[in-house]
Structure formats: C-alpha cells, structure tokens
C-alpha cells in the first residue's frame, strides 16, 4: 500500500509529462501523495500552464502574421491580374502600379518588423548605449519625413532647443521616435500640428510627442502597445499599418531602461510619453 501511494503519483506525473512532450499542453498531474510529490506535481502543472500560454500566444501570433501578409498579397495579386487580363485599362496602369509598389513596401516593412520583434523578444539584439543629444535624433527623424509633413500641411512645433543628453542606444531611440512620428503623420489632419517637448526629470529624460487629430478612445489606450493591435474601436488609430510599430516602441524603451505610455483627449489630440536614462 505504501509503495502504491508513492508510485501512483509518480506514474501520474510521468503520464502527464509524456502527454506534454507529445504536444498536449493541457496535460496536468494530480496534486496528491506525500508533500514532496505534491510540490513536484504543482511545479510541473505551473510549468505546463506557462507552456500552454506560450503555445496559445504563438498560435495567435502566427494567425495574425498570416492575416497581415494575406492583405497586401491579395491587393498586389488583384491589381496585377487586372492589368494582365485587361480589366484595368492601359491608361490606368501607372496608377495601379503605384499602389502595387506601396503594398510591396508595406509587405517588406511588415516582414522586417516581425524579424525585429522576434530578435528583440529573444534578447538577440545587442544594446550599444552611449551619451548623446536627444534632439539630434528627433531632428533627423523629422527631416527624413519632411516631404510627408509638407504634403500633409502639418505644422511642426517645439523642435530643437538646448542639447539634452540621454544615455541610450541611438538606433533604438531613432526607431522609437520614427514609429511615433510615423503614426502622428498618418493621423494628423491637414493643417494640424505635431509638437515635441523633452525635459530632464531626476536621472531620466521625459520625451513627449503630441499630434492634433481624432485622438484615441479611452477604452483603447491600455491596448495600443500590444502586438498587432490596430484600433478598430477608436477614431484615432485605424487599420492602416501592421499594428507592430508601437509594440516595438515599448520593447525598445523598456530595454533602454525607460517606460512609455499614451495619453489622449478623444477628438482633439494624442500624446506619447516615454522616458530614457539621462546622460551625464
């Protein structure tokens, strides 16, 4: 009887481990037997639960990837087929080739973003932090988007000022600022404003990037940094883009030792605030 009380729970745990090893992430071991075996079963079950969560996230991630890839591919194929079979008249070919080019670029950015996220979350991207002026990065990003800003008749405010030193990886910070400014340009109406502000607070530098426009619905604010989140429920962030840019921002800011959040007054403005270690 004593042997059965010991071997029974061990056999149960062994069977659960076999099922888990075969890919059944719902496998759990009964928590019974002596204290040591019960503790072991609890530890096993906690591990199995974590693996199940990871597997579910992976499945959702792959489903989102498939959906995001399918959309531009469908558009590209449809327009190319239309040009080949004559549905699209020759005089309109240039226009639709332009759309195909845009969708191809979107596809390339999506693939690059997914590769970036995979490497960042796996800790495979080295951090090369250094002390430098934050405003140089902000200015470089704005200048790189100068044509889009002019086309959108957007007013830029708060750019420049005295040097403000941060200690961070310049590539990380450039990507964060670029992604936020890219969103701001997309959602700022003609004649609207994108403004920049930054100041040192203790051993951190707080950066604020704000744009006028529809803003983000209050119920959407907690989710804007989630992977693949695209705000269908808010007028401030629609389905344009991959839903990966702000998620990448959060990862990069956190890796840099800072934090990021969004603020908004729906119908008026949206502001992204993030912190970075101050340079000495």
Regions found by a protein language model. Give the residues of each.
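Short helix-loop "hinge" at the ATP-lid/N-box region of the Bergerat-fold HATPase_c
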Residues: 184-185
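Membrane-proximal HAMP signal-relay module
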Residues: 1-62, 80-84, 89, 227, ...
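Short alpha-helical segment of the dimerization/phosphotransfer core of two-component systems
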Residues: 102-108
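Conserved micro-motifs of the catalytic ATP-binding
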Residues: 122-127, 165-168
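Conserved catalytic submotifs in the C-terminal HATPase_c
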Residues: 26, 30-34, 128-133, 150, ...
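Short conserved segment of the HATPase_c
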Residues: 216-230
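Glycine-rich ATP-binding loops of the HATPase_c
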Residues: 257-263
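Acidic ATP/Mg2+-coordinating residue in the GHKL
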Residues: 211
């Amino acid at each position: 009887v004593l042997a059965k009380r010991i071997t029974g729970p061990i056999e149960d745990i062994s069977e659960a481990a076999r099922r888990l090893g075969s890919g059944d992430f719902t496998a759990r071991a009964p928590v019974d037997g002596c204290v040591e075996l019960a503790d072991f079963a609890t530890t096993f079950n906690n591990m199995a639960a974590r693996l199940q969560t990871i597997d579910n996230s992976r499945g959702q991630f792959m489903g989102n990837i498939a959906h995001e890839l399918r959309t531009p591919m469908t558009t590209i194929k449809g327009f190319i087929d239309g040009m080949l079979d004559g549905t699209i008249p020759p005089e309109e070919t240039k226009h639709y080739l332009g759309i195909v080019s845009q969708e191809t670029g979107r596809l390339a950015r999506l693939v690059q973003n997914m590769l970036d996220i995979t490497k960042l979350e796996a800790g495979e991207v080295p951090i090369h932090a250094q002390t430098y002026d934050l405003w140089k990065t902000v200015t470089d990003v704005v200048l790189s988007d100068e044509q889009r800003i002019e086309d959108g008749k957007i007013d830029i405010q708060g750019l420049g000022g005295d040097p403000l030193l941060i200690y961070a990886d310049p590539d990380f910070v450039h990507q964060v600022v670029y992604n936020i400014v890219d969103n701001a340009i997309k959602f700022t109406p003609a004649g609207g404003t994108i403004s920049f502000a930054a100041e040192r607070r203790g051993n951190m530098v707080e950066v604020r990037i704000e744009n006028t426009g529809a803003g983000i619905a209050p119920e959407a604010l907690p989710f804007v940094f989630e992977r693949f989140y695209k705000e269908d429920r808010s007028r401030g962030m629609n389905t344009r883009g991959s839903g990966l840019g702000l998620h990448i921002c959060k990862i990069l800011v956190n890796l840099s030792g800072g934090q990021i959040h969004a603020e908004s007054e729906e119908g008026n403005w949206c502001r992204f605030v993030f912190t970075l270690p101050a340079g000495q």
